Regions:
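Histone-fold recognition with a strong bias for associated Lys/Arg-rich disordered tails
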Residues: 1-147
Length: 150
């Protein structure tokens, strides 16, 4: 996967997910790690979107933390993307293309995570988020703008 096509903030969220995996002695980067990275790096973005969607961000964050703590621990080895995390990032790329973007922004990563079955998407769905409402909130946030290189 070419991370050069991800915005700086998206790259930071992925890097944060890698740090979380290392700090917890885990090996695979799961969607829940990516969601935690987005929550930490894109706090203003997620705050806006979750407020629009009526989501209790604190509760969602706590669920994410509990899930991360429950994952298996290992010693050694380099972190790698799990199949679900890879699928979520591919969905984010597809969503970005649909929006006419050249770069994958945090909100596209959030949509990608929502679209791939995992604990991360289950937490968002349990919080009351739907694909249609998330898409509408993203559209409102972006006001029709695209991320293209000029």
């Amino acid at each position: 996967m070419n991370f050069d096509n991800f915005t700086i903030k998206s790259q930071e969220a992925i890097q944060k997910a890698v740090e979380i995996v290392r700090n917890h002695n885990e090996q695979s980067i799961e969607p829940v790690h990516l969601l935690k990275g987005i929550l930490q790096v894109g706090e203003s973005l997620t705050s806006y979107l979750f407020q629009k969607l009526g989501v209790n961000a604190g509760l969602l964050n706590n669920q994410v933390d509990r899930e991360i703590e429950s994952l298996p621990k290992v010693n050694g080895g380099e972190p790698y993307l799990s199949r679900e995390a890879n699928d979520a990032l591919q969905k984010a790329i597809d969503y970005s293309n649909k929006l006419g973007d050249q770069f994958v922004a945090l909100e596209a990563m959030l949509m990608g995570l929502f679209l791939v079955k995992s604990p991360a998407s289950a937490f968002m769905k349990d919080a009351g988020i739907t694909e249609k409402e998330l898409g509408a909130a993203i559209d409102e946030l972006r006001k029709g703008l695209s991320l293209i290189h000029i």
